[in-house]
């Protein structure tokens, strides 16, 4: 095997945008990784998920086609018979 071809595997501190920090090991130089989200603040792990409306597409759809009620389809089908 060739010597000195593998990067060093060192202790690294991961810092999240929420302020949470934890230690891990990585080959990234500098010993510090900055992350936007972690398991302490990510909506999937915290259970505080939100539906993101990208660019108002849901509102645009509702304006165009109207907001249907749950029983409206059944009432319409019964009226057609």
Swiss-Prot record:
One of its GO terms (molecular function) is rRNA binding. Its cofactor is Zn(2+). Zn(2+) binds at residues 16, 18, 38, 41. Binds 1 zinc ion per subunit. Transmembrane segments: none annotated. The keyword Zinc applies. The keyword Kinase does not apply. GO terms for cellular component: ribonucleoprotein complex; ribosome. Keywords: Metal-binding, Ribonucleoprotein, Ribosomal protein, RNA-binding, rRNA-binding, Zinc. Part of the 50S ribosomal subunit. Binds the 23S rRNA. HAMAP family: Ribosomal_bL31_1. Belongs to the bacterial ribosomal protein bL31 family. Type A subfamily. This is Large ribosomal subunit protein bL31. The lineage of its organism: Bacteria, Bacillati, Actinomycetota, Actinomycetes, Mycobacteriales.
């Amino acid at each position: 095997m060739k010597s000195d071809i593998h990067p060093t595997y060192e202790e690294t501190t991961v810092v999240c945008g929420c302020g949470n920090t934890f230690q891990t090991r990585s080959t990234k130089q500098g010993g510090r990784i900055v992350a936007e989200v972690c398991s302490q603040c990510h909506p999937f792990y915290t259970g505080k998920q939100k539906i993101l409306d990208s660019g108002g597409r849901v509102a645009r759809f509702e304006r165009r086609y109207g907001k249907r009620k749950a029983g409206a389809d059944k009432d319409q089908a019964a009226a057609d018979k």
